[in-house]
Design a protein with these regions (language model features):
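Active-site groove signature of glycoside hydrolases
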Residues: 100-123
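N-terminal binding-site loop/beta-alpha segment at the start of enzyme catalytic domains
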Residues: 1-74, 108, 141
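Conserved, mostly hydrophobic/aromatic
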Residues: 6, 18, 46, 59, ...
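Acidic-and-aromatic substrate-binding clefts and catalytic sites of carbohydrate-active enzymes
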Residues: 23-29, 47-57, 80-81, 89, ...
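Short, acidic/polar
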Residues: 26-38, 89-106, 152-160, 243-251
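Active-site mouth loops of central-metabolism enzymes
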Residues: 19-29, 79-95, 233-242
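Beta/alpha (TIM)-barrel catalytic core signal, keyed to glycine-rich beta->alpha loops juxtaposed to Asp/Glu
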Residues: 118-320, 330-344, 370
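Short cysteine clusters
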Residues: 303-312, 352-358, 362
C-alpha cells in the first residue's frame, strides 16, 4: 500500500481509505473483522461521519488494538437525535455528540477534526464568527483534534475552506461524473436520475478548487468516488458505460492534491477490489479510453492527466506539465507556488520537439504540442 502526504498535516495516509458508513448494516463482529482486514491490507485512514451508536461502537472496537496505526476523520456537528442523523451547529448537541464520538471510539484524540458538511457559502461565512467555530478551535488548541478538516460537496465552499489558512485538508466528492457538475448547495443534483446532456469536461469551479488546494497545500480525501455505485452500471452511469473500482480510484488520484479515496465496504471482497489499485497495470487503471469512447458527455480536447500520451521522446511528464498549465492559467498571473512546482520538473515544456507522437495516443484529442508551446511561453522555459 502506497501512502501520500496529506497536505500541510504532514500525515502519510494510505491511497485507499475506509469510509465507514455501511458498517451498521452488518453484525458487529463481522464489521469489526472488516476493519481488521482493511488494516491488514495497509489501509490506515478511516472516515467516521456517522453519529449512530452502533457504527461508532464498531469502529471503536475495530481500531482499539492498533489505534496509533489509524488516522481518523471525526466529524464535528454530526449528531444523533430521536434515533436519526441530525446535522447541526447548535452547541447543546454538537459538544455532547463529539464527546460521544471520543468515548465510543475509545480514544482521547481525533487526528482530523472535520467541520461537518458545509455546502452553503452563506453558512460557511456565518460559521467564521460562531460558537461552533470557537469550539473547533478549542479542540485544536487543546490537542483533542490534531488537525482541522472540512467536508463539502460544493466546490465554491470547499475553495473558501482551502483558502482560509486554518483548514488543513478537505473531504470532497470526486469522480468523473461529478467533476462535470456546476457548484450547487443541493447534493441531490449529484444523484439525479439524468445528467444534463450539455455538460462536458471538468466544471470550472471544481478546477478552481483543485488549484486552490494545490496552492495552499491542502490535501483532499475523496468521498463519493464511485458515485454511489452508479459508475459501475452502464445503464445508470451518465457516460453510458461502466467503470471499475480501480478506474474510478485512478481518476480521483489524478486530480491535484488528492491523497486518499474513502471507499465504503460491505465485504472483504470489496476491500480487495479497491486495494487492487495498488498492483493494477496501466491498462487496468485506464479510465480515459472508456470515457473517451462513451456515448454521452465528452471530455474531448481536455486533458484529464491520464498519462496515455506516454512515452515522450523528450522525456517530458506531459500530464504533469498540462496540470501545472491548467492551474496557472486560471489566474491573471502565474502563482508563485505553481511556478516553483513547474520549475522542479526535470524536463520543461520548452524541450518538446513537436513530433506529436503523443497526440496519436491521446484518447481525448488534446493538441499537446500546441499546449507545450503555450506552457513554455507562460513559464518562460
Amino acid at each position: 500500500m502506497k501512502t501520500r502526504r496529506l497536505g500541510k498535516t504532514e500525515l502519510q495516509v494510505s491511497e485507499i481509505g475506509f469510509g465507514g458508513e455501511w458498517l451498521e448494516r452488518h453484525p458487529e463482529e463481522e464489521s469489526i473483522e472488516l476493519i481488521h482486514y482493511a488494516s491488514s491490507k495497509g489501509i490506515n485512514i478511516l472516515d467516521c461521519w456517522m453519529p449512530d451508536p452502533k457504527s461508532r461502537n464498531i469502529i471503536g472496537e475495530g481500531i482499539k488494538e492498533n489505534r496509533d496505526k489509524w488516522f481518523i476523520q471525526g466529524h464535528i456537528g454530526s449528531t444523533w437525535k430521536d434515533e436519526q442523523y441530525y446535522r447541526t451547529r447548535e452547541m447543546e448537541y454538537v459538544r455532547p455528540a463529539f464527546e460521544d464520538l471520543l468515548k465510543r471510539l475509545q480514544t482521547d484524540y481525533i487526528d482530523l477534526g472535520m467541520i461537518h458538511y458545509v455546502d452553503s457559502e452563506e453558512e460557511w461565512d456565518d460559521l467564521q464568527q460562531s460558537e461552533y467555530m470557537d469550539y473547533v478551535m478549542e479542540l485544536k488548541r487543546t490537542g483533542v483534534i490534531r488537525h482541522i478538516g472540512m467536508s463539502s460537496h460544493n466546490p465554491k465552499v470547499a475553495k473558501k475552506a482551502a483558502e482560509s489558512g486554518y483548514v488543513e485538508m478537505i473531504l470532497f466528492s470526486i469522480n468523473p461524473a461529478f467533476d462535470m457538475l456546476p457548484a450547487s448547495e443541493n447534493i441531490d443534483t449529484m444523484f439525479a436520475e439524468e445528467f444534463d446532456s450539455s455538460l462536458k469536461g471538468i466544471d470550472a469551479d471544481r478546477a478552481r478548487l483543485y488549484k486552490a488546494c494545490e496552492e495552499n497545500d491542502v490535501g483532499i480525501t475523496v468521498m463519493k468516488g464511485f458515485a454511489g455505485g452508479r459508475l459501475f452500471d452502464e445503464k445508470r452511469s451518465p457516460f453510458g458505460v461502466s467503470l471499475t473500482p480501480v478506474q474510478c480510484i485512478h481518476y480521483a488520484h489524478t486530480r491535484p492534491s488528492v491523497c486518499s479515496i474513502m471507499c465504503g465496504y460491505d465485504t472483504k471482497e470489496q476491500v480487495n477490489d479497491a486495494v487492487a489499485y495498488e498492483t493494477a497495470t496501466e491498462g487496468e487503471k485506464d479510465y480515459a479510453s472508456v470515457i473517451a469512447n462513451a456515448p454521452f458527455h465528452s471530455y474531448k480536447g481536455e486533458c484529464t492527466y491520464c498519462g496515455h500520451c506516454k512515452p515522450c521522446a523528450a522525456e517530458l511528464d506531459i500530464a504533469m506539465i498540462n496540470k501545472f498549465y491548467d492551474l496557472a492559467t486560471m489566474q491573471p498571473e502565474v502563482p508563485a507556488t505553481i511556478r516553483s512546482h513547474y520549475e522542479l520538473l526535470e524536463h520543461k515544456a520548452s524541450e518538446c520537439i513537436g513530433c506529436q507522437e503523443c497526440e496519436t495516443r491521446c484518447p481525448f484529442g488534446v493538441p499537446i504540442a500546441e499546449r507545450m508551446e503555450k506552457t513554455a511561453k507562460l513559464f518562460g522555459c
